[in-house]
């Protein structure tokens, strides 16, 4: 008799995705972040659901309802802080996951990669709208500044912004629709993640060497399930350290001041995970140019497969490309730092140089290093 997990229609899908899935025998801890992102998404949906039970999406009561959750709801404070810091963990895992894809050449699975880019945009949109919901000073002004960027679109810009706002400024209509979108988007992300996995399982996973590993596969369970559980424990440890010891470490103190349209905060800045893109936006004096650079800072990932010139898939045996990759990481950290600084000398110049370097690495230096390494192989 066939095992039920191999015969039952539903169990069969789970079996082929998480149990009997043939996986390369040499994938490292960098391959853990996919499952960790799944865990983060589940944590965010569950904590978000409980927060939504007590939250009110009205400009008069939104701030008070968040305070009420923290003070009066049983364990409301921990649910709120798991949700807020869970978003930070989500982005840490996301950046590691994308970085792994760039380093080891996983982008050659173009369908999986493009769905991943779409997922990244959706997650960023969700996080942005979630940041608006507590209706603090940074929520209000962040929403005003970022939505206002759309007015840079020629001809339809102003109408588009007012359509998104639901009026002539960020107000009750904006908050209500942002709450509605923030609630529905995680479920869309779940569906996209399933499609992401579907495309991945068509080709099988990549591995650190970048070489086809069909001759040496092992079952996902128990080898990688146990490895994923270790990753999960470490994620939980870091998240709970954040939540229980310094829950506001990654937040902005201005968001504890209720939103006031008549008083602008001294430094308007988004959450830390958007600072690199915000720095690129600010480094271009022209509004439309800045918006284009902001979108391209993520969209540039879509042309990485087209600019892959090396004969080797992975960077494992390509020292020149490795140097460029770590230069890119350092550049992103620099941009993140600049995004949190005021717009004054020398930060403006550093931001502009870091932005130029960011695009140069992807568009010029990486393809050139691939060609040079191909030549070196012939020596």
UniProtKB/Swiss-Prot annotation:
Q: How does it assemble?
A: The cytochrome bc1 complex contains 11 subunits: 3 respiratory subunits (MT-CYB, CYC1 and UQCRFS1), 2 core proteins (UQCRC1 and UQCRC2) and 6 low-molecular weight proteins (UQCRH/QCR6, UQCRB/QCR7, UQCRQ/QCR8, UQCR10/QCR9, UQCR11/QCR10 and a cleavage product of UQCRFS1). This cytochrome bc1 complex then forms a dimer.
Remarks, miscellaneous: Heme 1 (or BL or b562) is low-potential and absorbs at about 562 nm, and heme 2 (or BH or b566) is high-potential and absorbs at about 566 nm.
Which family is annotated?
Belongs to the cytochrome b family.
The answer on whether this UniProt entry bears the keyword RNA-binding reads no
Keywords associated with the record: Electron transport, Heme, Iron, Membrane, Metal-binding, Mitochondrion, Mitochondrion inner membrane, Respiratory chain, Transmembrane, Transmembrane helix, Transport, Ubiquinone
- Put simply, this protein is called Cytochrome b
Its needed co-factors are: heme b
Q: What topology does the record note for this protein and the membrane?
A: Multi-pass membrane protein
Q: Where are the transmembrane segments?
A: 33-53, 77-98, 113-133, 178-198, 226-246, 288-308, 320-340, 347-367
Residues reported to bind heme b b566 = 97, 196
What does the entry's cofactor note say about binding and number?
A: Binds 2 heme b groups non-covalently.
Source organism: Genetta maculata
Q: Which CDD domains match?
A: cytochrome_b_C, Cytochrome_b_N
Identify the Pfam families for this entry: Cytochrom_B_C, Cytochrome_B
Q: Where in the cell is it found?
A: Mitochondrion inner membrane
Does the keyword section mention Metal-binding? yes
User: What is one cellular component GO term in this UniProt entry?
Assistant: respiratory chain complex III
Please tell me where a ubiquinone binds in this chain: 201
Reported function: Component of the ubiquinol-cytochrome c reductase complex (complex III or cytochrome b-c1 complex) that is part of the mitochondrial respiratory chain. The b-c1 complex mediates electron transfer from ubiquinol to cytochrome c. Contributes to the generation of a proton gradient across the mitochondrial membrane that is then used for ATP synthesis.
Instruction: List, alphabetically, the Gene3D superfamilies matched.
Output: Cytochrome Bc1 Complex, Chain C
Q: What is its main location?
A: mitochondrion
| SUPFAM superfamilies the UniProt entry points to | a domain/subunit of cytochrome bc1 complex (Ubiquinol-cytochrome c reductase) (SSF81648), Transmembrane di-heme cytochromes (SSF81342)
Which residues are the signal sequence here?
A: none
What processes in GO biological process is this protein linked to?
A: mitochondrial electron transport, ubiquinol to cytochrome c
């Amino acid at each position: 008799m066939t095992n039920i997990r191999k015969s039952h229609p539903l169990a069969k899908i789970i079996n082929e995705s998480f149990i009997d899935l043939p996986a390369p025998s040499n994938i490292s801890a960098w391959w853990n972040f996919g499952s960790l992102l799944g865990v983060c998404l589940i944590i965010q949906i569950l904590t978000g659901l409980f927060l939504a039970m007590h939250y009110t999406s009205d400009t008069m009561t939104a701030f008070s309802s968040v305070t009420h959750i923290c003070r009066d709801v049983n364990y409301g404070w921990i649910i709120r802080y798991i949700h807020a810091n869970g978003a930070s963990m989500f982005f840490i895992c996301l950046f590691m996951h994308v970085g792994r894809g760039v380093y080891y050449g996983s982008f050659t699975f173009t369908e999986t990669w493009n769905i991943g880019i779409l997922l990244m945009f959706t997650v960023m949109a969700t996080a942005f709208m979630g940041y608006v919901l507590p209706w603090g000073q940074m929520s209000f002004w962040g929403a005003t500044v970022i939505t206002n960027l759309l007015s840079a679109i020629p001809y339809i810009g102003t109408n588009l912004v007012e359509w998104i706002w639901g009026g002539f400024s960020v107000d009750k209509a904006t908050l209500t629709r942002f709450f509605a979108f923030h609630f529905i988007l995680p479920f869309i992300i779940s569906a996209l993640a399933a499609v992401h996995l579907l495309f991945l399982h068509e080709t099988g996973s990549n591995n650190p060497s970048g070489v086809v590993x069909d001759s040496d596969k092992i079952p996902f369970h128990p080898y990688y399930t146990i490895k994923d559980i270790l990753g999960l424990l470490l994620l939980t440890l870091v998240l709970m350290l954040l939540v229980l010891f310094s829950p506001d470490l990654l937040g902005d103190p201005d968001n504890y001041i209720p939103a006031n349209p008549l008083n602008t905060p001294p430094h308007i800045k988004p959450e830390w995970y958007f600072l690199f893109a915000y720095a690129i936006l600010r480094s271009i004096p022209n509004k439309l140019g800045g918006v284009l650079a902001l979108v391209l800072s993520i969209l540039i990932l879509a042309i990485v497969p087209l600019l892959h010139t090396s004969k080797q898939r992975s960077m494992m045996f390509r020292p020149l490309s490795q140097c460029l990759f770590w230069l890119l990481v350092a550049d992103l950290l620099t941009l993140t730092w600049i995004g949190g600084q005021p717009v004054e000398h020398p930060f403006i110049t550093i931001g502009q140089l870091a932005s130029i370097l960011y695009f140069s690495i992807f568009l010029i230096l990486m393809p050139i290093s691939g060609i040079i390494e191909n030549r070196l192989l012939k020596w």
